Amino acid sequence: MHPRFQTAFAQLADNLQSALAPILANHHFPAMLTAEQVSTLKNTAGLDEDALAFALLPLAAACARTDLSHFNVGAIARGVSGNWYFGANMEFLGATMQQTVHAEQSAISHAWLRGEKGLAAVTVNYTPCGHCRQFMNELNSGLDLRIHLPGRAPHTLRDYLPDAFGPKDLEIKTLLMDEQDHGFTLTGDTLTQAAITAANKSHMPYSHSPSGVALECKDGRIFTGSYAENAAFNPTLPPLQGALNLLSLNGYDYADIQRAILAEKGDAALIQWDATAATLKALGCHNIDRVLLG
């Protein structure tokens, strides 16, 4: 078990500990539960879905990287597939505050990058900030997405974001988590192809500036992130943050990164290179390449 989970795990009910122990035994537990695992945990612990999600929130929050605020937020995105995806906030010392990943963004991008097609609910241990409410409004679940908070009745995103502005106001039909493939040809080595594949998945209906990042760890493991734009622009999630989020959720550290590649168009309206390189260098990675999409 990764050390970050030990304190939260010790506070769980005994029957839930017994069911979770083999799942968490892997140091690189992927911070997600399959629909089958969720069903097993519900039956073993005698909990319904909502109660189980609340019980697991401390494990999600344990994934937080909060060197600046020391305020850990955990979230669980519940996919329409039945799979559950952990998320937690991330802060990057030496970079800028704008590079921060919020817990809801973390869980949602985690689900998206693992191929989830839509979300039924998000469970989070603190009320979503305005930034996250706007980020969630880009999803194909729209304002019907259910939000679950401890000690409160569940509400929809519509309740938390009244008079919402979103992609429909800009006549955008393809939403975040809808399947997208921009068709860029895969070239180069495995890591380069992974970055291009991530760029092909980009949600960028406002700037038409696709981009993807691939990070290779010293053990050969590769994590990718795709660009996810938002109708309100500022809640947009850059591709590097998506990749770093997956890397961290899987129990890796920034020091494990040995190489990074950004794939983007050289003539795009928005360019990720400077911000991507600056953030990676702040985290200790200097082996950074860029491939131009054709």
From Swiss-Prot:
Residue positions binding Zn(2+): H102, C129, C132
Boundaries of every CMP/dCMP-type deaminase domain copy: 48-168, 186-294
Quaternary organization: Homodimer.
Gene: cdd
Active site per the UniProt annotation: E104
Keyword Zinc (UniProt): yes
An MF annotation (GO) of this entry: cytidine deaminase activity
Enzyme nomenclature, EC number: 3.5.4.5
Family matches, as NCBIfam families: cyt_deam_dimer, PRK09027.1
SUPFAM superfamilies xref list: Cytidine deaminase-like
Binding site for substrate: N89, M90, E91
A Pfam short name: dCMP_cyt_deam_1
TM helices/strands, residue ranges: none
Reported function: This enzyme scavenges exogenous and endogenous cytidine and 2'-deoxycytidine for UMP synthesis.
UniProt-listed PROSITE patterns: CYT_DCMP_DEAMINASES_1, CYT_DCMP_DEAMINASES_2
Keyword annotations from UniProtKB, A to Z: Hydrolase, Metal-binding, Zinc
Any Gene Ontology biological process: cytidine deamination
Enzyme class name: hydrolase
Cellular component GO terms, alphabetical: cytosol
Record note on cofactor: Binds 1 zinc ion.
Name this polypeptide is given: Cytidine deaminase
Cofactor(s) listed: Zn(2+)
Family indicated by similarity: Belongs to the cytidine and deoxycytidylate deaminase family.
